[in-house]
């Protein structure tokens, strides 16, 4: 065994050993329990970042732990390869997105392999490959035929200069990110998934997910947003019907969760696209201008929440069905046409948004809810104004004094008797629009025929292949300019037809990839029935909390869709979910001439610390001049505070990177980058290597201790007690608790006790062998390369076949224990006694201690309290 720890030599050797033995290549094996461990697959952006390293190390630790425990473990990997960044990079570098993507995949795959992850690379998939997205297209056509996928107009951000649709994040202050042109809202035909058909099941099945973080389940519940409320129809006033047709000329319909406040409505607000707004604006230029302004605004709900609320009165009126009040109709920029009825009733006295709007435009506020003796002030919003639970109705005629539920029932009865409303359950969740007017995505398998309409591409003509030799120019959809792509024959009538040139939302690919891993080369469907039956659901899923809503919700939705197609036999995709925290690092900057910030990489900064180790000042190494310390933030390119994993691996080795990531913080918490922490992790690995080296130098490996320990010295028994209690703790930390930092700390404590124990005797060397073999097995999930190498020196066999160490219960039974001695409740000494010492023996031993004799001062004991195994308290 070489004396020095050299990761650059041992890590490639260990990886070659695993690859040659193909130990991570897995197939269905009914003789073993299965364990499917999956970390969210990466977008091939070019390089791994530290967040990737943390995510995949967590998955690898769990996979290797389960492997040693006899499970048939699948840990696959692939690439979430479609998406806008590839198009942006392609335009910047004048290269096809496909070429850019495949180059990145090759480099990142090399990085993943250098970290020693126990990945079954035979299952590798890239979502941009036709053999993958073929089956996504197939499912789309099946769901289109069932009506779960449908086409309707949707609102998008249109850049009139680049002649293209922009994502919400590409609109900056109302202008296109490339052209700078003012963005318009446009209605275009788009495809939607009826996720709302599954809203109730998606909501209810959250209760089945016992091993998901409550925070994630709460976020999904709120996103689905089930509410019980009432549809209310306000009759359109006779003098306000001009230009309206059908039901729109008869009534304005709204949905409210607070019908108890209906008597307090003082106006109603409609979206700019509402027919009532259009009719009112017909002869009013100021309304037309406001409607145009609204249509130019963002279509993102998040932006709606933070933007300034604006409105204009239409001069049209509707009638409150409860009290006959005439309410003016306003056009407001905070009302969305695509959400609900595109209209809301406004109760300024009891809704904070309405209160602010009414204050801004001097509209009336009518109190109809009272809470205790609180006084209503129309000039100042107070939290109790919106209190549904504790309020009672006032200023509401014969409804006065009623609580929410009583008023709800009474108002429902009144409205239903008039045909003016009824109770309704509604969801915040909206159908999922999956059409994207971009190139680098999965083509939508629909053909548009003038004779036959929208025709799904037949299965035997799939996949509709995306041409890969295209370099986008940012001016509209490349596919819409390629007759060789869109010109085709109708599958029904054979006549000339046109392919759909939109592509699918990239959330589509990540909504089912975990099933494709089960049989990635299966050519007769999305997943083979045998593989789906064996692997079932993912046992452990790992990824960031930022995916709590959309990705995880869509994956749950797709699982139910595939179940209903008879493709899988599970209701939920992920049995257990771990959301790891971010990797964060200090940030530094200097202000530039334009008033902006030039961010400086931490490696280029020199710090000065106070006597408590806190940074007090920082200078740039290059010029010695000050930089601003800006606090700790998530590692990112924008803040220039990232650390390249490859540099870390080159300097210290993959095991050091893995150990630091697992030891620096519990997995669900943020991990703060620390150079000293990395050095500390490397020091521990050098110590582990040195410990085994010194042991072997003293006489080579021996047979590890096993069997009856009665003949061992107390010191060796204590070491074995520590060893087997460590096995129990680490097993629990890896398995149930998933707290890897405390598992590492436990092994460190074990090695500390080993260093203090004399193991020079023949029995001592056998116990030392047991301790070192076990420590290596316990650490293999986290630092597999060094452990693989040390195991071969200690044991000569294959560590991956060694199994997880078992707890020797006999070693946990102590023959002697330490008991505290107190006099009048104060600690005065300790005694070592037999573990089975009687009460009388404990009392006698305690009374004989030097501390007891001294502090009893010759007085007799009034009482002696014995807590078995812990203490003896002498009361004088």
UniProtKB/Swiss-Prot annotation:
GO terms for biological process: leucyl-tRNA aminoacylation. The keyword Cytoplasm applies. The gene is leuS. It is an enzyme of class 6 (ligase). ATP binds at residue 637. One of its GO terms (molecular function) is aminoacyl-tRNA deacylase activity. This is Leucine--tRNA ligase. GO terms for cellular component: cytosol. Coiled coil: none annotated. A motif ('HIGH' region) lies at residues 42-52. Its main location: cytoplasm. Pfam families: Anticodon_1, tRNA-synt_1, tRNA-synt_1_2, tRNA-synt_1g. Belongs to the class-I aminoacyl-tRNA synthetase family. PANTHER family: LEUCINE--TRNA LIGASE, MITOCHONDRIAL, LEUCYL-TRNA SYNTHETASE.
